[in-house]
């Protein structure tokens, strides 16, 4: 049984989903989804928005049924918090702060950045790391930046089966990477965007928080519904790192004298070298 998309034209209208961009900023390839031009703005055909949204829901259910993950992408100001909350609630991955180049096409580099994040967390938790207060403060600052950029993908160990994107023009690098790898892209597309590289177009106002939230919530609910019907647990993408037993923080006696200086210098050198080469901090 498919997830019933109960969203109405009235709700879309009230959210402002029908407002496109100025006629001078349109992309002709969006013409099939435009209802009319009014007062210098293009008005999106919400009947087509609703029809496309129902197709999108079916696609999401198929993706979950194939046991593939979904990556929500929305780094613009209006979308980032909505994307983060929705992804966490339905247990899927997200990129809401910054799209790191190679997040899909060079996953090995991103995984190395995640390892650096995990290692920094271990050092911050250990009371005998051998680091000075200044080094610990710098480490904490870099940890915040790393966590900010990697929070939603730190557990993404394989390529997603679907990207859900807010404004493919703004997220063109993410869309291009997905295209290179043959990963289908679903996107909220405004009248100024090129829908050509998008597999599942949802025409709507992608600058209005009300419009974004309304549509993203439908997509999120479709994910949750599919997982419940299939008995798939919802695991938060922002859970702490899963560490093997040998990586657990261990309290060891501190070395003394020259041995302490040597250990601190060696560990510190390796640590800062790893951090300086970390892609997510650039």
Swiss-Prot record:
Entry keywords, A to Z: Ribonucleoprotein, Ribosomal protein
Region (Disordered): 245-265
GO biological process: one example: translation
Gene Ontology cellular component list: cytosolic small ribosomal subunit
Secretion signal span: none
Keyword DNA damage: no
Entry keyword Ribonucleoprotein: yes
GO molecular function: structural constituent of ribosome
Matching InterPro entries: Ribosomal_uS2 (IPR001865), Ribosomal_uS2_bac/mit/plastid (IPR005706), Ribosomal_uS2_CS (IPR018130), Ribosomal_uS2_flav_dom_sf (IPR023591)
Matches recorded under NCBIfam families: rpsB_bact
Cited PANTHER family: 30S RIBOSOMAL PROTEIN S2 PROKARYOTIC AND ORGANELLAR, SMALL RIBOSOMAL SUBUNIT PROTEIN US2M
Similarity comment: family membership: Belongs to the universal ribosomal protein uS2 family.
Protein name: Small ribosomal subunit protein uS2
Organism per entry: Chlamydia trachomatis serovar A (strain ATCC VR-571B / DSM 19440 / HAR-13)
Protein encoded by which gene: rpsB
